[in-house]
């Protein structure tokens, strides 16, 4: 084990190991063959804008979503309404280094990728002085429990199932993983490898469903041409029920 702050190396012989080390997990390589995360070709442009400089029509306690060809934007208040959080997802050029997650962003690149915008969205995006750029990666949906645990090693969160942000469930699934992991770890009547097997059996299928639904949502949000007209008509006719996911919010 290498201590990040001091660089000191220490050899440990733990009873069990949990890999919660994110998208570029090293622990994952002890459970599965070493492969790189999948490049989606999408970037998430992110910013926080003080609410006092937000256009008046957007100073509300609502979540607002714009969808368009190969893009979508989500805006919502945070910190008790003090700031407006903005996330804009569109195709873009990857940074040279991929091991970080937060990079400087050139607003001109973002606006070029977005194309023609609704005036309300354009106004608020242009009010942002500084944008950040997050490359989006994922992995294919889990195919079996063996992809989340092996022997005395278990994977949690993005180390096991990184997902696209189109369902906003990456952190949620990691929290559910942690709760299931704690439940299984408490099974002191079982050997460690059986506890982790039980954990993986509890979690893999739900995580796979969320991964797959996130990919599906992205395709819907970013539709182009006649398909987006059909999407818009369906949204007008069906309203919120079109995107409803009761199986998700009912819990595992």
Which residues does each predicted region cover?
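Alpha-helical structural elements of signaling/regulatory helical domains
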Residues: 81, 116-120, 187-191, 205, ...
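Alpha-helical membrane-targeting segments
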Residues: 212, 216-252
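Conserved FAD-binding catalytic core of PHBH/FMO-like flavoproteins
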Residues: 1-129
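A generic structural signal for secondary-structure junctions
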Residues: 32-35, 50, 91, 186, ...
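Short linear loop/turn motifs
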Residues: 127-132, 249-252
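Conserved mid-domain beta->alpha element of the FAD-binding
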Residues: 18-23, 75, 109-110, 130-222
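Alpha-helix N-cap and coil->helix boundary residues
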Residues: 40, 191-194, 229
């Amino acid at each position: 084990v290498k201590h990040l702050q001091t660089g000191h190396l220490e050899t440990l012989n733990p009873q069990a190991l949990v890999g919660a080390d994110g998208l570029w997990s090293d622990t994952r390589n002890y459970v599965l063959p070493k492969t790189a995360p999948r490049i989606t070709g999408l970037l998430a442009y992110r910013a926080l804008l003080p609410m006092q400089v937000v256009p008046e029509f957007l100073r509300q306690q609502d979540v607002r979503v714009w969808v368009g060809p190969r893009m979508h934007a989500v805006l919502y208040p945070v910190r008790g309404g003090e700031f407006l959080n903005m996330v804009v997802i569109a195709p873009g050029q990857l940074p040279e280094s991929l091991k970080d997650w937060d990079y400087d962003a050139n607003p001109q690149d973002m606006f070029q990728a977005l194309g023609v915008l609704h005036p309300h969205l354009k106004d608020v995006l242009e009010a942002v002085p500084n944008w950040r750029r997050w490359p989006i990666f994922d992995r294919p949906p889990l195919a079996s429990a063996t992809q989340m645990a092996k022997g005395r090693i278990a994977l949690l969160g993005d180390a096991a199932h990184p997902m696209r942000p189109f369902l906003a469930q990456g952190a949620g699934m990691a929290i559910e993983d942690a709760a299931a992991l704690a439940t299984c770890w408490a099974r002191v009547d079982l050997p460690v490898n059986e506890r982790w097997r039980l954990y993986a059996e509890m979690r893999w299928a739900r995580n796979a469903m969320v991964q797959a639904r996130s990919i599906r949502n992205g395709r819907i949000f970013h539709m182009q041409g006649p398909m987006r007209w059909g999407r818009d008509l369906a949204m007008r006719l069906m309203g919120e029920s079109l995107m409803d996911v009761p199986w998700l919010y009912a819990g595992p």
